[in-house]
Amino acid sequence: MLEKLFRLDGKIIVITGATGLLGRKHAEAVACYGGTPILLDLSQQIVDDFANELNAKYKVDSVGFEIDITNEKMIKGNVEELIKRFGKIDGLVNNAANNPKVEDSKKVN
């Protein structure tokens, strides 16, 4: 019964920060329930590799895009491309983080 309730067949779900720890789990859950995870992160190679993994395991049509969530122009261009390619966006998982405290902590020895 729960499986039927949570099915995402035919749904296009965009996931920012898709190759991080939680992003990967979100993408796998979307794919597992029949949705199409659209993977956004900072490295094209990494999102492509992850999309290929999801496609092989779950038989979905996942794709990835290199996107910097702090770049508004990139985001607008990506949305236009996604609408052109898929005709819609059904959901968004805002998983990417832009936390200067995290960046600063990397500099501390």
What role is predicted for each listed range?
Residues 50-58:
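Short, conserved SAM-binding/catalytic segment
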Residues 44-45, 65-78:
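The beta1-alpha1 cofactor-binding region of Rossmann-like NAD(H)/NADP(H)-dependent oxidoreductases
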Residues 33-50:
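Conserved glycine-rich Rossmann-like NAD(P)H-binding loop of the short-chain dehydrogenase/reductase
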Residues 82-87:
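Glycine-rich phosphate-binding loop signature in dinucleotide/nucleotide-binding domains
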Residues 76, 98-109:
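Conserved mid-core segment of classical short-chain dehydrogenase/reductases
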Residues 3-38:
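Canonical Rossmann dinucleotide-binding motif of NAD(H)/NADP(H)-dependent dehydrogenases/reductases
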Residues 12, 36, 61-63, 88-90:
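Structural signature of beta-strand start/N-cap positions in the alpha/beta core
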Residues 16, 89-97:
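Rossmann-fold scaffold of SDR-type NAD(P)-dependent oxidoreductases
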